[in-house]
A protein has these predicted regions:
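DNA-dependent DNA polymerase catalytic subunits
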Residues: 2, 10-43, 52-305
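Catalytic core of nucleotidyl cyclases, primarily class III adenylyl/guanylyl cyclases
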Residues: 49
Length: 305
């Protein structure tokens, strides 16, 4: 391969999206007589997120459905503007053929960005499909990750809906209720799912595991060690390379002498570790930390002051 080809693709992509950004800003500033206002709230490799509040305010529509209908038509006009400017770009770079096209994806009334490619949108229309009730589009946020405990996935989605449509007090009340429910769940429901790799690499005959062992691998090695110590390997299979596991933090002190344990399906009762599950740490890391990533952006708290 030739690195210059890769660089050319990257630079061409950057030029294309920036060209579209300039075209949309110029069109909206001219249409709304706003001078040099930046209407682009976020950009990605091949997409623009455009704020059209000023346009909606100008026409004086308040009915939500009519606003969505108006924005659908307005986006059609913006598509035409982008197409015209891409024709000019093709001529500018002496392109063999003009192949660049941008289409409207979603219409949303609320959006929260925590970082690049990490956002929540309250979507009313997606590529021409109109929703009776708005649906959340969640990208890069913890709720949609497979590493999030099962007990938290739906609750994170629910609380994101509250953040979009409710108040800070509503959010705090939900957290308080879910925390009470969370502390009543079993270990399997609150543990972090992972795939375990490197059991041989990180195993140490003297100390069970080596330094810098990933926490879920550490928990797996401890689990296997306890099985062998308690002579339970005929009753429960050991954790093997490549298997799916779940790990949870433990209160200190506890019978393992460590802060974590991993399992495959369920925690063997012979381990006698149920009362040592650290629900406070699990709740903080599985629910509060990803939630704070969103709440910090809008200046809300997770508890009453």
């Amino acid at each position: 391969y030739d690195e210059r080809n890769a660089e050319a693709v990257s630079v061409a992509g950057q030029l294309s999206v920036q060209w579209a950004e300039n075209a949309v800003n110029k069109y909206l500033n001219t249409t709304l007589s706003t001078g040099n206002k930046d209407y682009i709230v976020a950009m990605d490799t091949d997409s623009l997120y455009v704020c059209l509040d000023s346009l909606v305010s100008r026409i004086g529509i308040t009915d939500k459905e009519k606003i969505i209908e108006f924005l659908d038509k307005a986006c059609g006009r913006i598509e035409e503007v982008i197409k015209k400017n891409y024709d000019e770009l093709a001529e500018y770079v002496n392109a063999y053929q003009q192949k660049m096209v941008m289409k409207r994806e979603v219409i949303a009334d609320t959006g929260i960005w925590t970082a690049k490619k990490h956002y929540i949108l309250n979507v009313h229309d997606s590529e021409g499909v109109r929703y009776e009730e708005p649906e959340l589009k969640i990208v890069g946020i913890e709720a949609v990750k497979s590493s999030t405990p099962q007990a938290c996935r739906q609750s994170l989605k629910e609380i994101f809906n509250i953040i979009i449509s409710g108040t800070e007090d509503d959010v705090i009340s939900y957290i308080e209720k879910f925390k009470e429910k969370f502390f009543g769940l079993n270990m399997e429901e609150v543990a972090f799912p992972r795939s375990v790799n490197g059991l041989k690499k990180y195993k140490d005959p003297a100390t069970i595991y080596r330094k810098s062992t990933p926490i879920h691998v550490k928990g797996s090695l401890i689990y296997n060690h306890i099985l062998r110590t308690k002579k339970l390997t005929r009753k429960y299979p050991t954790i093997k390379e490549g298997e799916k596991v779940k790990f949870t933090y433990l209160k200190d002190p506890n019978p393992t002498g460590d802060k974590v344990i991993s399992i495959t399906n369920s925690l063997p009762k012979e381990f006698e570790l149920e009362k040592y599950i650290d629900y406070d740490t699990q709740f903080e890391k599985a629910f509060i930390e990803p939630l704070k990533g969103v709440l910090d952006v809008i200046g809300w708290d997770t508890e009453r002051r």
